[in-house]
């Protein structure tokens, strides 16, 4: 497995991976090609992808608010799961964030997603049951 930075040329493969991994996709909002291209231009290192034989089999989007780093959109092709790809992408995310001086790493995980919760616990993350997530959106497309 090779981990390398994704580029906008990988966009179609990213969308296919999200679909195969059953991640929701907002093509008119945050996941549009234009939005992803802008983020990749601003922070190219925030888009690591895992490849097997030049095939995208895993990826993550990293973000930070200068205090905490966020692991977002972690996806692994179901045919390639249980091979350490997700853990490698988490480790790569932490390494990238440490280079920016970030020392707190976070992930938002849907309550029903037991597999992801188990994965992050195995990677040393602590579940905070006393925290409730709020959001406000300008539309359902974003």
What are the residue ranges of the model-derived segments?
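A short helix-loop-beta-strand connector motif used in the catalytic cores of GNAT acetyltransferases and
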Residues: 38-49, 70
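Conserved acetyl-CoA-binding loop-helix of GNAT-fold acetyltransferases
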Residues: 76, 82-95, 118, 122
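A conserved beta-turn-beta hairpin within the catalytic core of GNAT-like acetyltransferases
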Residues: 63-72, 81, 127-131
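Conserved catalytic-core motifs of GNAT/GCN5-like acyltransferases
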Residues: 106-110, 117, 121, 126-139
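Conserved beta-strand in the GNAT
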Residues: 49, 55-63, 70-75
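A short beta-loop-alpha structural element at the N-terminal edge
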Residues: 1-14
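Conserved GNAT acetyl-CoA-binding A-motif
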Residues: 97-109
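Conserved GNAT-fold acetyl-CoA-binding loop/helix
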Residues: 11, 15-38
């Amino acid at each position: 497995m090779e981990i390398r930075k994704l580029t906008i040329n990988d966009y179609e493969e990213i969308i296919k991976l999200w679909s195969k991994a059953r991640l929701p996709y907002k093509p008119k909002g945050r996941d549009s090609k234009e939005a992803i291209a802008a983020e990749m231009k601003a922070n190219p290192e925030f888009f690591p992808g895992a490849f097997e034989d030049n095939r995208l089999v895993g990826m993550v989007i990293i973000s930070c608010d200068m205090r905490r780093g966020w692991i977002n959109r972690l996806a692994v092709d179901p045919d390639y799961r249980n091979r350490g790809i997700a853990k490698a992408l988490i480790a790569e995310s932490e390494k990238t964030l440490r280079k920016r001086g970030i020392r707190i790493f976070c992930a938002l995980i849907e309550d029903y997603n037991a597999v992801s919760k188990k994965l992050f616990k195995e990677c040393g993350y602590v579940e905070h049951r006393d925290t409730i997530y709020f959001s406000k959106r300008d539309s359902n497309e974003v």
